[in-house]
Every structure is written in structure tokens, then in C-alpha cells.
């Protein structure tokens, strides 16, 4: 968090997604969904969000009579946009900033409590959403991640939230080492780019591969196993194969 002063008033500004409150994140997602729907211009939405962060409830802060304060806020606005600009889905740093939605519990940070079966379903929906989405992919993603009943329809905020969290976790796992129990583990060896045009992660067919090993039991047993347990098992298998080739 960063402390600034607007006149005599101290304001605490978040410096990353880890610092934002539930209300700040919800407001951001509402504005972002409005931008995507074409209801508001992106720059206007970003200014509105920044005004919310600094608690500005008056005239436009960009036209303040106090030039020094106005210049300071403009500079801060540009600095802040580096990490929450609305030209892209937010990188939530693998943190679930919306743990509850209408009483429905979402996944833990880093999808810590998600089963392998649910993770694979989410990967399919994520892939669909990145290619050509008519809304079915983001709805499916939200239903799996928040275990929504058939009568509950996810809103735009929840759909964006699920896409953002899923993208953040997959990007972190597939791009390089991450810390697991104090040890750096490079899960990128599990993800094989170019495995097929319909398989951007390279994880298609992996469930059958793991089931054949019998480590987690049958096909159903693998799907019911924690996602991280299966990922670490796959990591060990990939590393063993690499050693055999040397």
C-alpha cells in the first residue's frame, strides 16, 4: 500500500491486486464489464475507478484549481494504470479476489482446493473462451469454479473473475518456476505447446495416462484427486523422462 495526501487527507492506495479490498475489486469488475459491453469508454471507466480508490466525490480531479495536487493525481493515475488498466483482463497474481458470490464459494487462491477433473473442465472452457466465445465458455467456467446450481446464472462480473483467475494460474504454471512449499518447481515441463491446435496446454489425454499408472486409482479416482497432486506427479514423471534421455 502507498500513502498519499490529498490536501490534509491521507489516502492509502493499493499497489497490487493483493492490496485491493473486496469492494474495490467488485467496482473494478463492474466497470470493466461495462467497458466490454460498450456502455462506457475505457478511459472514463479507468478515471472512475481511480476516483473510487482515492475517495474523490466531487468535481473532476483532473480539473482541480490546485495544480500541484491535480498534477500529482494525474501522475499517480498513470502509474496505477500499469497494473489495473482496463485494456486487458487483470492478472490477479493467482489470488481469488472474489471468494464468495451470492453465497457460493469459489476456489482457493492458486485453485488450491480444485480437483483434477474440475481443472481439466476449466481448461477446456478457458480454451473455448480464448478462441471464440458466445458466452457459453465463460458461463461454463463460472459454473465449475463456483459449483453453481442449474437455476443460478453467473453475471458478467463473475464470468470475468473466473477467466482472470484461471488465466493467471495457468500462465504462472506454464511460464516458469513457482514456489511450492519453499521449493522452486518449474511446471512448464508439464505443458507442451503445439500439442495440437485444439490442445494449447498439451494436457489432453493426460488423465488416461495417469489412470493407467494406477497411482490415483481409476479414471474417476484421478478426476477426484486434487489438481496440485496430479500436477506434481506429472512434473516428477516429466523430469524422470528427461533424465532417462540424457
Task: Give the role of each language-model region.
Residues 1-246:
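An amphipathic, hydrophobic-aromatic interaction surface with interspersed Lys/Arg
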Amino acid at each position: 500500500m502507498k500513502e498519499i495526501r490529498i490536501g490534509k487527507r491521507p489516502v492509502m492506495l493499493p499497489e497490487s491486486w493483493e492490496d485491493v479490498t473486496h469492494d474495490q475489486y467488485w467496482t473494478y469488475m463492474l466497470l470493466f464489464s461495462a467497458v466490454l459491453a460498450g456502455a462506457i469508454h475505457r478511459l472514463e471507466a479507468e478515471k472512475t475507478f481511480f476516483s473510487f480508490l482515492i475517495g474523490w466525490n466531487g468535481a473532476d480531479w483532473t480539473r482541480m484549481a490546485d495544480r500541484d495536487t491535480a498534477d500529482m493525481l494525474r501522475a499517480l493515475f498513470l502509474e496505477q494504470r500499469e497494473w489495473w488498466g482496463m485494456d486487458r483482463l487483470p492478472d490477479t497474481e493467482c489470488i481469488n479476489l472474489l471468494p464468495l458470490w451470492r453465497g457460493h464459494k469459489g476456489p482457493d487462491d492458486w485453485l488450491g482446493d480444485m480437483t483434477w477433473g474440475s481443472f481439466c473442465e476449466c481448461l477446456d472452457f478457458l480454451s473455448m473462451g480464448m478462441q471464440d466465445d458466445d458466452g457459453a465458455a465463460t458461463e461454463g467456467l463460472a459454473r465449475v469454479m463456483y459449483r453453481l446450481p442449474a437455476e443460478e446464472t453467473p453475471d458478467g462480473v463473475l464470468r470475468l473473475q473466473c477467466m482472470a483467475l484461471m488465466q493467471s494460474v495457468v500462465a504462472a504454471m506454464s511460464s516458469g518456476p513457482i514456489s511450492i512449499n519453499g521449493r522452486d518447481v518449474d511446471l512448464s515441463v508439464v505443458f507442451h505447446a503445439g500439442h495440437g491446435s485444439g490442445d494449447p496446454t498439451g494436457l489432453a489425454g493426460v488423465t488416461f495416462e495417469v489412470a493407467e499408472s494406477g497411482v490415483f486409482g481409476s479414471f474417476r479416482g484421478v478426476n477426484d484427486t486434487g489438481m496440485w497432486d496430479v500436477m506434481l506427479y506429472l512434473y516428477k514423471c516429466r523430469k524422470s523422462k528427461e533424465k532417462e534421455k540424457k
